[in-house]
Each structure stands twice: as C-alpha cells, then as structure tokens.
Amino acid sequence: MTKKIFLSLMAVLGLLLSAHAQEREITGSVKDHAGAGIVGATILVEGTTKGTTSGADGSFSIKAAPDNVLVVSFMGYQSHTIKVGTQTRIDVVLKENTQAIDDVIVVAFGTAKKEAFTGSATVIKSDDIVKSQQSNVAQALAGKVAGVQLTNTSGQPGESPKILIRGFSSLNAGHDPLWIVDGMPYSGDLNNLNPSDIESMTVLKDAASNSLYGARGANGVVMITTKKAKSQEAHVTIDAKWGVNSRAVQDYAYITNPAQFYELHYSALKNYYVNSGMSIGEAHLRANTNLTANANDGGLGYMVYTVPSGQEFIGINGKVNPAATLGRRLVYEGKEYYIRPDDWTDAAFRSSLRQEYNASISGQTGNASIYGSFGYLNNEGIAYNSDMDRYTARLRVDYQAKKWLKFGANANYTHFRYNQIDDSGAGNSSGNVFAYTTAVGPIYPLYIRDGEGNVMYNEDGIKLYDYGNGDNAGMERSLFPNSNALSDSRLNKQEAEGNAFNGTGYIDVTFLKDFKFTFNAGVSLDETRSTSVTNPWFGQFASEKGMVSKGHQRNFDLNLQQILNYTKQIGSHNINVMLGHESYQNRIYTLSATKSNMLTQENDELAGAIIDKQGAGSYRVEYNNEGYFARVMYDYAGKYFASASYRRDASSRFHPDHRWGNFWSLGGAWIISKENFMESTYEWLDNLKLKASIGSQGNDNIGNFRYTNTYTIENANGKVSTVFNAKGSENITWETNSNFNAGVEFSFLRGTVSGGVEYFLRKTTDMLLSFPVAPSLGYSSYYANVGDMRNSGVEIELNFTPIRREHVQWDINLNMTHLRNKITMLPSERRTKQVDGYSGYVSGSTFFGEGLPMYTFYMRKYAGVSDEGLSMWYMNETDDKGNPTGKRVTTTEYAKASDYLCGDPIPDLYGGFGTSVNFRGFDLSVAFTYQIGGLAYDSGYS
C-alpha cells in the first residue's frame, strides 16, 4: 500500500514537472504600422492574470506554454491575439483603431466613451497643439474646431484671444467660455500654461456637455488635460524651437509717396476754393499758398521739398514741380534744421526672434507614476519694446496605494515678465503705434534733424522726436499734434512681472465593487506687479517731468468637489449614476499708486518721484458659486444611449432671494451602423451615429453687487464722504440659455473619410440688460432681466486620409460653420428708435434692434466722389417743413449726412482647413482659418 501511494505521488510530481517544463521564455516586440515600438502595451496570457508590458523600444519578455494564447493590447489600437505554439519569439504589429469608437473623451467631472457621448464636443490632441507653434494655448483652437471663433485684440506677445463658441450669447453678460484644467475651473492667465504640457483640449458646445457646470459653462467649456506618465520606462524629451515673428497682415494701399500726398491735398484745396466761387487761377494760387500752412488754413503744416527760387511747388497741372527736391534745409530762430520725411512703418516694426526650450521626464515605478517638465519661452513682438519671457515648471504624481485607493497631485508654477507698448489695442488713438503709422502722412518727419541732416539729441542723450508741436523749425502737424506714438513706444515703459501657481489634488476611493467616491481640490494663485513710466522729456507728461505708476494684483481661486459614481453592467445594459457637490471661491485684490516729477527715468520706483498724484487706491472683489448636480448615463447593447443631467446653482452676484437657479439637459444617441439590417454596409461603413440633446443653462457674468446700491468713498476737503455710485436691483436673477443640438457622425473605409454634421439652436431669455436713466436721478443705469436673443447654425467637420502606408500618411481636414444671430425681443424702455422698420436703441455706431443681429453698424454711408472731387454721403431728404420725403439724396457736408443700417460683423461662413504629411517620422503641416462675409469698420482707413 505504501509503495502504491509513493508511486502515485511520484507520478503526480512528474506530471507537474512536465507541465512546468513546457513553459518557456517568449520574447518579442510590439510596434505600430510605421515600425515604431509601442511603449506600455499590455501582453497578457489569456484566461490568467499573468502579464507584462512592453519596454521603451516596444520589446517584451514573458513565460508561456505552447497551448497558451497571448493577448496584446494598447489604447487607440485594435487588440491582437496569437497562439504561442512552438514559437520562442513573437513580433506583433498593432493596427490603429480607425473607427476610434472606443476612444475616451474628457467630459464634465469625468470621462466617457466617445460612442456613448450624446453631446457636441471636439478634441484636439497634443500633436496638433504642438504643431500650431503657439505661445498661448487658446491660439491652438484657431481653425481647428467648428463653431469656434478667435479674435486677437492686440499684437502683444502671449496675449489671450477673445473666444466665441457658437456666437454671441448675451448683450451685457459676457461671451467668454469656461476653462477647465484637469477637472478644475481655471480663471488665471492662459499664457501661464505651457502648450507642451498639454495632452488634449476638448471643446464642449451644447447643453448635454456643459449643463453640469451651470452658469459658468453657459458660453461653452474648454477642457484642458495635462500630460502624465504612460509607461514604466523612464521617458525623457528635450526640444528646442526657434522662429521669426514678422508682420503678416500688411496695410492697405495707403499713399506712401510724398509728392502724391501733396498733389492730392492740393487738389482737394483747389476744388474747395473753386466751389467757393474762386476762378481756377485764384484757386490754384490759394491752394499753393495754404498747402503747407497750418491746420486753420487747411494746410498740412510741413514743407519737406526744396523748390527753386521763384517757382511754384505745384504746377497748374496739379503735379509737383519736377525741379523740386525732397529734403529742405532752413533756419528757424537762429538754428539750422533739415526737414525730410521718415518711413514710420519701417521704424515702428521689426522681424523679431522667438525661442522656446522644453524638457520633460516621465515614468512609472511600482504603483506610482510621475511626470515632470520645465519650459522657457522668449518671444519678441513685431513692435519695438514689446516682448515676453516665461518660465514654467510642472510636476504630476499619481499613486495607486491600494486596489481601492488612488490619489495624486498636479502642480504648475509660472514666472513671467512682459514689456508692452502703451496702446496695442484696436483703437485709433494718438498713442496707438498701429493706428498712428497708417494715419500719419508720408511727408512728416519722425525725428528733429540739424542742418546737416543728423538726428539731434537732448542733454540726456535722448533722440529728439518730432511731436508736430512747432519744436521742429516751427512746423505743426494737422493730425495728432503734440504726439509721437513711436517716441512713446521707445521711451515709455509698461512692464508686468509676476508668479502664478496652480495646483490640484484628488482622492479616489472604490468600494462595494460598483461605487467610487472622488474628492477633488484645486487652488490657483496669480500675483502680478506692474510698472508704468511716462518719459519726462516729451509728450503730455513732459510738463510734469514724467510719471510713474505701480500696481499689484492678486487673484486667488479655491474649488472643492465631492463626487459619487455608481457604475453597473447587467447583461447588455450599462448604467452610470453620478451625484456631486461643488463650491467655488474667487478673490481679487488690487493696489495702485501714482507719483510725478521723477528724479531720473532709471529710478522707476515711487520713491524716485516727489509729487503724490493722490491716485493711490485699492479694492477687493469676491465671488462665490455653489452647485449640487446629478447625471445618469445609460446604454443598451452599445447601440442605444441616453443621458440626463441636473444642476442647482447659487451665485453671490444675485440677491439671496434670487440666487438659486435650476439647469438641466437630456441627450440621446443611436449607432445605426451596429444594427443587423446594416450588415451589407459593414465592409465600407465604419460608424454611423445619430445624436440629439436639449437643455438649459444660466449666466451670471455681469460683475458683482448689481443687486444692491453701491457707493464710493471720496475726499471732500479733507473729510471722508460717500457718494452714490450705482443703483442696484434686487430682482435680477439668472440669464437663461436654452440649447438644442442634433447631428450625425460618420466614418467610411476604415477611417479614410470621417466627420460630422450638426445643427444647433440657442435661445437666450431674461437677458441681463443695463438700463440708462436720466442723469438727474444721480446714477447712470441699472440692471434688469429683459430681452431675448437667438443663435442658430450648422457645423460641418470633415477628415480625409488619402494615403496611409507603412512609412507615409497624408491627412486633410476641413471645418465650416454657418451662424445666424438675431435679437428677438427688447423691452419697451430700450425701443427708443425706429430704423427701417426695426425697433431698438443706438449705442455709438451700433444699432441694437429687434430682428437684427447684434452689433449691426449704424453710421453714415459713403456715396462716392462728386464731379467737383468732393466726398459725398447719403442723407434723408426733408421738405421745407422738415418732414421726411422718403427719398435718399447725397450731400458733401458730413454733418448733414444721415445714419443708416450698414450690415453686421457676423460672417456667413467661417472655419479652418489644413493638411499634414508624415514620412518616416518627418512631419510637414499647414493650417489656415477663413471667414466669408461679415463686415469690419476700419476708422483709420476711412
């Protein structure tokens, strides 16, 4: 008996040893279609928990038996299975998941499978962000997303553009989208984010996507996800970029020839005198005399030609005397001067250098993953004295402490410095270099020169600029007198320097198998110090011997989120339920002071000037928002999808009795291509999906304390007094946006052609409008909820890959948007004027009327040139009693011209297109934005 037991044990042991002996070391690699190794791919023995991941070059090693099956997978690629058999080396090439139907996209408070998403969203990957070569992350959206418009407000390096998502949403309550960085609202400067740190940007455009963010997401949401470690191997990246900034948009065909400029002005003067009753000969003589006289006589103020003695400057034929030479030497008040024109545009702008350096390291060790980066950017503007420096550092750590516990943190630090010119915006003031150089005539000098033509200097070694105020041989400009924008840009100082910190942290706790609780916390702190110095030598502050201003601003945000998720799969049914709470606090603190009479411009501190301008001040702004929210997502068999969300929001910008608002959304989708009756299309149709959503959101973006009366504290003969500032309205509450979205997504021929078409409708009701009142009431206006607006349109996105081979790929993309905007209702108090059957009100050169788009131009309309060479404008004819006759006539007197509706700036079609070719790792790409239709008013050109 004992012998039998012993033999049986030996037999079992032999079988075990035999089975173990059958396992052997399998080596291999995992690569993509281009032959590049895939880092972090999972290699798993099917039916077991035994597995490994591929290394930095895609290689792997695993023990497996001949009858085992290996499953190789990686996100974005189709899984691959292979039986081990007798092989000792297995090389796998993974195919891209061209349908991308299982891609995960970032949505409100989490992620979702793209196929299950019922809303409207566009994702921009890191590769496209880096290719755009932008300093500001917002610029990476240009031309990439249907329905999104970007407008640059200045040429300052790093300046954030204005962004519109699906048109204007309000008359007074703002249009800016909400920015989310790693799940947390972000109100800091977008220029503090390094584009090289960004993994993806997702633009959410409809109520199903945005309603969980309540009021702050009413104008759309842009979600930024930063990079994290993707593989166990350490991955180090270093890149350096150099480029040149140059002026891309040139001027119109302005007159740049001094002789032609004089001739045209002479012609205008001559025609004026002829129309006043002079003979042609008399008009010719008077025009020659007054051509270079001061502005009171209709002259240009400057004579920059030398004309032979006894000869006329302009002949009877209206042409400059061919014997006249450019440049003029003269003596004025005992000093010799040489007067000649300068090229102001050439002096104002330059081709400048842009240089950027980035380094990052990432990897996983044990249960921890780490990503760290450092970046430096130096970007010089196209205008002198405009530039920026930015240093960024980021550290992200994620740690899986237990199977049920995960936590992590993500911190970003930025140090920045800007130099900018005084006025770089869209205005046409005398301090704006861009407007100045196009408006100033080609006859005017930039500098004051001595009799030899050398630029003169003052006692401090500063070049003498010509301010057109008589300092240059007594000559005075008729346009922009006592100003020189180029001098201001060179000698004045506008500097900002500061630090920004943005940090987020999270804790995930999984329990009872199907539940997960998440706590998120985010904090943002921006500190900016500004210095403004106006030079003591020239310009409007020369009499005060210069002026220095100091400013400091702190922007602090705190956001806390508590989220509970329940996820369950029962057969073909999948359900996710989310409940959450969010609180948001924003605090802004400012401090400023100004002094004049500087000892020296080099000392730009307040202690370096002696006269207190009594301009010191400070203020604090507080804003609080709290919300409770819920969402349910359901799908059946991966074909039918539904979602519903609800948020109850409170805002400190409203009276306590009206602070809470309720917002919701419903969405559904159907993947038709998965139906059995579509089986005949399986070979060429990858994906066909119908979707629709509806919902509402609020908007509270009107500033603080509009619901209560406010007062200012002033100095009244050395005593403190309060002065009424603004009238409050207790009854104001949320402006509401109701959204409808319907669309179709498609993909053909294994991803060769893909895209989507969407229709959207957004109605804004209870618009927050500012009501002007009579000045005798002691305040200028108050806010109320009145007025409606409508935006509707169609978006189209198309992607085409005509070539996809092992070593080469060619991609083409196109998007377009057609948008219509209309004010549908205004209160009777604002319908103060009737124009062409439309009721509304006038603000500056804009008419806001029922039935018209926002910002419809209302101004004088040019009618051409009269037979006498005079400019003409249209006017409404009236009879002898002043009653309108209904006829439109012309006039040469600008003051008598009538105002008319002249169109609006909203384009009929806008979007972007581009193409990229990748060959063996070398990439060539170009991208364009376009706009068809829409009007712009250029006051400088007019």
Feature locations, PLM:
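Extracytoplasmic gating/loop element in the C-terminal half of outer-membrane beta-barrel translocons
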Residues: 332, 651, 867, 931-942
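A surface-exposed, glycine/aromatic-enriched loop/edge motif typical of exported proteins
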Residues: 251, 256-323, 414-474, 586-594, ...
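Extracellular/periplasmic, surface-exposed regions of secreted and cell-surface proteins
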Residues: 129-132, 168, 175-176, 182, ...
